[in-house]
Amino acid sequence: MIKGIQITQAANDSLLNSFWLLDSDKGEARCLAAKSGFAEDQVVAVSELGQFEYRELPLDVQPSVKVEGGQHLNVNVLRRETLEDAVKHPENYPQLTIRVSGYAVRFNSLTPEQQRDVITRTFTESL
């Protein structure tokens, strides 16, 4: 469990009135603010702080989700034949809009190579 503290008495004067996060599960303390002796965000073992008294501070912790990697999905509700016909007859599809990398784009504004790439990526045999 993590709790916030302000040190009110300590043998080490540089700890006085400093603010810390104590992680009782890891036995660590993270310095939030100190006048001297400790850097902001410095992590030390609680035992390194020596004897001290403190007052507990209320914490408002917002859980954060850390996502690394992942997938991206663009949904285009079309038939393959529609896109292939739009390549051959762009004049028949002036308003055909698709999603590419999160952006809406007119299919006819893409280069022929990009159009083929969209068709290939959109219509696959399997995932």
Curated annotation (Swiss-Prot):
* Residues annotated with Glycine radical modification: 102
Q: Name one GO molecular function term.
A: formate C-acetyltransferase activity
Keywords of this entry = Organic radical
Q: What does this protein do?
A: Acts as a radical domain for damaged PFL and possibly other radical proteins.
Q: Does the keyword Plastid apply?
A: no
InterPro entries from the UniProt entry: Auton_GlycylRad_Cofactor, Form_AcTrfase_GR_CS, Gly_radical, Glycyl_radical_cofactor_GrcA
Q: Which SUPFAM superfamilies does this UniProt record tie to the protein?
A: PFL-like glycyl radical enzymes
Q: Which HAMAP family match?
A: GrcA
A Pfam family matched in the record:
Gly_radical
Gene3D superfamilies under this entry?
A: 3.20.70.20
GO terms for cellular component? cytosol
Query: Protein name, please?
Result: Autonomous glycyl radical cofactor
Q: Which organism is it from?
A: Actinobacillus succinogenes (strain ATCC 55618 / DSM 22257 / CCUG 43843 / 130Z)
Q: Which residues form the Glycine radical domain?
A: 5-127
